[in-house]
Amino acid sequence: MIIKQITDIIERFAPLEWQESYDNAGLIVGRPDDEVHKALLAVDVTEEVLDEAEAEGCDLVITHHPIVFRALKRFNSADPVERCVERAIRSRIALYACHTNLDSAPGGMSWRLAEMLGVGNLRVLQPSETGDGAGFGVVGELPEAIDTVEFMRIIQRRLEVSVIRYSDIATSGVRRVAVCTGAGSSLIGEARRAGADIYITADMKYNDFMAPDKALTVADIGHFESEYCAIQLIFDILSKNLCTFAVRKSERSRNPVNYLV
C-alpha cells in the first residue's frame, strides 16, 4: 500500500487545510507514492519510537506532533530532531503528523478526551472560520453533577494522570465541562462564556490560573496526558477503513515531562 492511500483516510477525517498557520502537519519524511507495509502510531517521533519502529518492521510512523516545526539548517545529529529525521531517512521510515487539523476536526482530539471522561451532548467551544463543524475545544455535560475534586480524581484514574494543577474551586459541583487538549489557555474566556463549571486543558501559565476569577475551575492535566488519546483516535480512524494494512500502537511513546510526587 502506498503512503497516500493511508494519509488520504486520515485527511478525509481531518483535512490538512484545517491546521493552524504555524503548524506543519502532513507528510514530513517520505514520498506520497512510497510503498509501506506497517504503521506505528505515537504522540511524538523520538529515538525510542524509531527503535520500536525498526524492531517491529514499521516503515511509517504517524504521530500527533510534527517532529519538524521550523526549517532545519543542518543535519549533523546535534539535536534530537536532526538525529530522528536523519535516522528516519537512512532507515527509509516515513514520518507523517496530524496535529491541529486533528485537534479541530469534528470528533477529533477534544471530542475523544471528553468522551473518555463521560461528558456528553458535545458541541464545539470555538468554531473555526472554515465551518464544516470544525473548531477547537468542546463543551458538554456530565449525566449528573459531581463534586469538583472527585471529578478531578476520576480524571486522574481514567487518564493515568499523576498531577493536576488547578485554580481555585469555583463551585462545589461540576455538571458542565469544557475540554481542550494541548495548550488551551486561549480558550478560558470561551469556556467561561459557555457556562462551564470546569475547564480541562494543559500548558497553563501562572497568571492563567487567576483568569477564571472563580467563575469556573481550570484544571491543567498536562500536555502529553491530554493528547495521549491521539494514538487510539488515529488507530480507530485507520482501522475502520483499512482491513489489510497493519497498524501498531506504540508502547514506547512516553511523556518527556517527569514528576516528583
Q: Which role fits each region the language model picked out?
A:
Residues 1-261:
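Active-site catalytic microenvironments in core metabolic enzymes, especially phosphate/sugar-handling
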